[in-house]
Amino acid sequence: MIRTLLIIAAASLVACVLSIGGFLAVGGVDAIRNGEFEFGPRHWRTDSRHDHDGRHGRMRDAGPTISRTLVWNGTDRLQVDLDADIAFRQAPTASVTISGPKGLVDQVQLENGRLRLADRGTPFHFDHDGRDLRITISAPAVRQFALNGSARLEVADYDQPDLALSIAGSGEVQIRGKTQSAALDIAGSGEADLEGLTLAVARVSVAGSGDARLAPTDSADVKIAGSGDVTLQKRPPVLSSNISGSGDLNFED
């Protein structure tokens, strides 16, 4: 039994050495020296200034700044699964314009109201801080917004009977306009500033350390689990709250 285990261990060691040798042979030394790869227990990450060319681990520059327009029919839901600065404005005509480094802009896809970066089918990830991509969107009837990650979304001229906003991660959202009711869900450390949104009824759920600011005039239902904060511009006539953890419900008045 011991002999078998020793044989397996020796074979694993040989395989590991061969794998590292292969990586170094195809340019791994230069990549490590230049800081283009980070080794971790779960993944390798490319330096944010480069992109993977899909051949053998070498990197290429993300390219010049360009603009690109996407075709969109303007559904009632917008889901953001990438890191970017996004400006949304309610308007009669739907349009999407993306600007940033060519290597990033060319990867942006919009399918069924979902913004994301294309999967290139490699174990390498092009890392960026979200400031590289700027996306301007207009559409007539979006009523649901979902942010996954650390995107920043600013919504202007919102005018719909209701609003549903969810943030998963550390995203930031600011919405200005008017609606009758709003449902806000934050999971993580995201921030939602809805003080510029005129509304009557609000339902707020914060799980984690997120922060929400609203100004409902008639009623509010607030649930906090964790260390999150919810600030209401004033105490509405009807208010219910459930707080578990160190979170706070505050009033500005």
Predicted regions and their residues:
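Short, flexible, glycine/charge-rich loop motifs used to bind or transfer phosphoryl groups or to couple energy/partner
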Residues: 68-69, 106, 135, 153-154, ...
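Preference for bulky hydrophobic residues occupying beta-strand positions
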Residues: 70, 78, 96-98, 117, ...
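Right-handed parallel beta-helix
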Residues: 146-193
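Terminal or extended low-complexity segments
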Residues: 2-3, 79-80, 86, 162-168, ...
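Acidic (Asp/Glu) and glycine-rich low-complexity loops/linkers
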Residues: 2-148, 156-159, 176, 197, ...
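Short, surface-exposed interaction patches in beta-rich subdomains
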Residues: 173-253
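Short, recurring structural edge motifs at helix starts
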Residues: 64-65, 150, 170, 209, ...
